[in-house]
Amino acid sequence: MSKEYSDVDDFASDEEEDNQVLITGKDAKKNVIQFDQEEDEEEQEEEDEEVQDEEEPEDKVVQLTEQQIEKEKQRRLKKLKSDKKTKHKTGVVYLSRVPPYMKPAKLRQILTRFGEVDRLFLKREEEHKHQQRVKSGGNKKTMFEEGWAEFIRKKDAKLCASTLNGNIIGGKKGNFYHDDVMNVKYLPGFKWADLTEQIARENDIRQAKLQLEISQANKLNAEFIHNVEKSKMVNKMKQSKKRNQQESQQVDEEVRRTFKQRKVASTRASAPDSQRQSQPQSKALNDVMHSLF
Amino acid sequence: MSNSEFKSLGCSKWLVEALNAMKIVQPTAIQKACIPEILKGRDCIGGANTGSGKTIAFAAPMLTKWSEDPQGMFGIVLTPTRELAMQIAEQFTAFGSAMNIRVAIVVGGESIVQQAIELQKRPHFIIATPGRLAHHVLNSGEDTIGGLKRVKFLVLDEADILLTETFSKDLATCVSILPPKNKRQNLLFTATMTDQVKALSDAPQTEGKPPVFTFEVESVDNVAIPKTLETTYLLVPEHVKESYLYQILTSEKYVKSSCIIFVNRTVTAEILRRTLKSLDVRVTSLHSQMPQQERTNSVQRFRAQAARVLIATDVASRGLDIPIVELVVNYDIPGNPDTFIHRAGRTARAGRHGESLCFVTEKDIQRVEAIEERINKKMEEFTDVGDTAVIRKSLTKVTAAKRESLMAMDKEGFGERRKLQKRKNESKEKTHRRT
């Protein structure tokens, strides 16, 4: 399955389109967890919280008496536990096909019939495919190929899969999507984090590797700079030596190090033998030559 | 008339006028020698420096003969690279526009069906690369390739490279459908005399045909590169080449000049392109692992000076005629000294001034010596960019950019497709052997 979402860009590319949808989902969750952030930072959700959200409750805390703070803490702890539980309870469904040109908002509306949907991701069709479709006179709208949806409760996800899978969307008879057959699969033991985990891990590895390589390159560079300075020094020493000795004796240039040289290979007829590439002529080539002149 | 020269060589009036309109007035040595002989109907082998007008040397007599008796599928020109084929086709179209000439380009990387349709229309001239033409010969019907049996001219441009193992199989297929060798005229043009070309010029005379006319400008003066070309070298360690290149490209002298950078491998070309692009140099590239559309685009971009730096492998080393090129950088030194001549020949064309710079690493000394021996000229040391400038201005920046582009390439899987193709071919060969 990793193949389907191995490309990070795919995730990013959808943002303009279904960002609102995603954010609404996130906001809903934020409201739930808003209070339990300041002290239990290690428990923070993976989602990035905005600074504003953090400040508001702080002001409130100052005004409260100690007893109330204690109460508040208790409450928060409870909330946190329940929240952890809800995280356990989430269920993810996979949609192998999205009805043509259906937008995330519409799909969310359909899935919400079965329960609260948190996050939803649809994979857009590839750029060249889209271009080809438009070129050959097709619809210009964006099409989505497949998608994942996260239900807050597993129960709802299962219900959604068993009800919607292989059935038409239904609703009012005249609806555009009335007769589209859905394909929904509940993914047992699968969490939303599993989807993004691999990409995140790969990114991390790549970043670490990059840092390592850059530091290595910097070492090489430092060596190079050192060598350049050294060569300047040596050159100056040689010059002054020459001046002193007035070229009384030839300075012997001893060979300090030799490098293995890359091969020279010439095909020219008049090239010296040492450079010639030995080229056994094949029959095919001979035939061609005979048929030419 | 100022252009009576071309007329005196025997070219048609309309062609002389067309050449005149393009400010081509004075024939070069190879044109003077070859055009009359080809018009007489002799086979011809022509060798001359880069940028000395070999294309017109075969185009002019072919067009003259064709205009006397216009017929479909009059001549075939075979070239080793797609870009060269396109360039020659452009020139043919330009010369013959007054005569409603039809020229077909048959090269790889483009629609086979489209090409077959075009061949059915019987174009006057076909400019092709051997691989794709062979494919048509093997797979197309009689109505598409039947006309090839009456071809009057066969031209092998850059014959030295066409007559190697790489092309032999496809070339044999292409030639097999043409009329027998004494019914057509064969023209070979090259800047290098290889064993194969030599062997052909020494080949016994075919019956019913005048002897082969061989002409070599090179033998007159033993200098293989244009006189207006300045050759310099720069000693530089392998891992800081990029920094030097960047510094040179952004140095005051070259900040505006168009230049081609030659590398030995497609991977190097891709790394350099990404690195320089991230450093805001207007750069484009040309190598065999790009889709044909992109290849064509990048040559056009470079021609139109939308990009000022072209990074290329040896696919661009031959024949491409882009007059604006001022500097050729040999980022890697080629193993074959003659490749250097071809690469350097992208600049200093038709009497213009040009420069060629070699990046010499500790392992390339022998190669450079071979080149110097070949061109009969000692290179001078390049002094415009000093070590201090590189260390101060570009070293850190470029190394970081290079690593980043390496990472990006790794992520995007550069070269995967080629590996896949290779594996496929190998397995195909294996099954072929078994059966």
Swiss-Prot record, chain A:
SUPFAM superfamilies: RNA-binding domain, RBD (SSF54928)
GO cellular component entries: nucleolus
Key words, A-Z: Nucleus, Ribosome biogenesis, RNA-binding, rRNA processing
Superkingdom of source: Eukaryota
Biased composition (Basic residues): 234-243
PANTHER family to which the protein is assigned, alphabetical: ACTIVATOR OF BASAL TRANSCRIPTION 1
Coiled-coil portions: none
CDD domains: RRM_ABT1_like (cd12263)
Family listed: Belongs to the ESF2/ABP1 family.
GO biological process, one term: endonucleolytic cleavage in 5'-ETS of tricistronic rRNA transcript (SSU-rRNA, 5.8S rRNA, LSU-rRNA)
Location of region: Disordered: 1-68, 234-286
Compositionally biased residues, Acidic residues: 7-19, 36-58
Biased composition (Polar residues): 267-284
Residue ranges annotated for the RRM domain, each copy included: 91-181
Function: Involved in the small subunit (SSU) processome assembly and function, and in the 18S rRNA synthesis. Required for the early cleavages at sites A0, A1 and A2.
Localization annotation: Nucleus, Nucleolus
Molecular-function GO terms, alphabetical: RNA binding
Protein known as: Pre-rRNA-processing protein ESF2
UniProtKB/Swiss-Prot annotation, chain B:
Gene Ontology BP term (one): rRNA processing
Note on domains (UniProt): The Q motif is unique to and characteristic of the DEAD box family of RNA helicases and controls ATP binding and hydrolysis.
Location of the region described as Disordered in the Swiss-Prot/TrEMBL record: 409-435
Compositional bias segments (type: Basic and acidic residues): 409-429
Transmembrane segments: none
Domain Helicase C-terminal: start-end pairs: 244-391
Alphabetical list of SUPFAM superfamilies matching this protein: P-loop containing nucleoside triphosphate hydrolases
Motif Q motif location, chain numbering: 4-32
Chief localization: nucleus
Protein name: ATP-dependent RNA helicase DBP8
Location relative to the cell: Nucleus, Nucleolus
Annotated organism of origin: Kluyveromyces lactis (strain ATCC 8585 / CBS 2359 / DSM 70799 / NBRC 1267 / NRRL Y-1140 / WM37) (Yeast)
Ranges in a coiled coil: none
